[in-house]
């Protein structure tokens, strides 16, 4: 069997660094049970992945997308925007989305400070060594 070299794959993937990343990702996919597209011929997974790239049985663009997807921690999902929901306190009165008037409850500074005091944790007392 002929040895797979980087020169066999470099015309499929221009950048050698990208080639190494893609071949390593494909080798990990094979290790995790992904289906082979060529015969193994007693080769190890990195060699099989390079042979797959050289023989163009797997697309480098598809590998790149799968690699990016595997590295993402949070997958962005386009969720539909929520429809306009009527307010609970409106008692059946419909509220237009174009209303710009907003009712704001005013409070004095003293009321605000009293409210904040209730939210603040109690001060810690220093511990004394005995």
UniProtKB/Swiss-Prot annotation:
Claim: Transferase is one of the keywords in the record: yes
GO cellular-component term (any): DNA-directed RNA polymerase complex
EC number of the protein: 2.7.7.6
Pfam families assigned to the protein according to its UniProt record, in alphabetical order: RNA_pol_Rpb6
InterPro entries: DNA-dir_RNA_pol_omega, Pol_omega/Rpo6/RPB6, RPB6/omega-like_sf
Reactions that this protein is recorded to catalyse: RNA(n) + a ribonucleoside 5'-triphosphate = RNA(n+1) + diphosphate
Superkingdom of origin organism: Bacteria
Disordered: annotated segments: 109-130
A molecular function GO annotation: DNA-directed RNA polymerase activity
NCBIfam families xref list: rpoZ (TIGR00690)
Record note on quaternary structure: The RNAP catalytic core consists of 2 alpha, 1 beta, 1 beta' and 1 omega subunit. When a sigma factor is associated with the core the holoenzyme is formed, which can initiate transcription.
Protein name: DNA-directed RNA polymerase subunit omega
